[in-house]
Amino acid sequence: MAGAFEVQIRSVPADRAAKHAVALSEVVLQHHRADGIQIQAQPLTGGHLLHLAVAGCVFNDLYVLAEERGIRLTEVRVVATGGFEGEEPTVSTGVSYEVSVSGEASEEELRELVGEVDRAASIPDVLRQETAVSLSGVQVQATR
C-alpha cells in the first residue's frame, strides 16, 4: 500500500442532493475487486468513517490475498465496531472487527487467509502504531 493517497468529500447544492441523494444503506457501489459493495453506516460521522477505513481495508486485502492464493471469494462481510469517550479531545475506545467470509477453499484456508490479512492490513496496522495527522492547508471563500 505504499504511495501517496488523496480522498475527497464535498458538499453538493440542495437541488442536486434532492434529486440524487439516497440513504447510504441503499447504495450499492462498483468495486475494483468484488462484484459490488454496500456500506452500512448511519449517520456518516467521522467515527463511522474511521471504522469504515478499517473495515474497507480488511475487505480489500481479503480479496487481494485470496486472488494471490487462487481462492475465489463468494461472500465477504467485515463489521468494525468501537466508540469514543471523554470530552474534547475525545479518545477512541478502540476498534474491533469481525469477518465473515465464504469462498471456494477449505475452512482452514479461509481461516489462514483472515489471519494473514489481520497481520498485514495497512489501516489497522497504522492505527495500532499510531500515525501523525496534521492540517496542511486552508482555503476559504467568504460570502458576506
Protein language model features and the residues they cover:
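Alpha-helical metal-binding/catalytic segments enriched in His/Glu/Asp
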Residues: 57-58
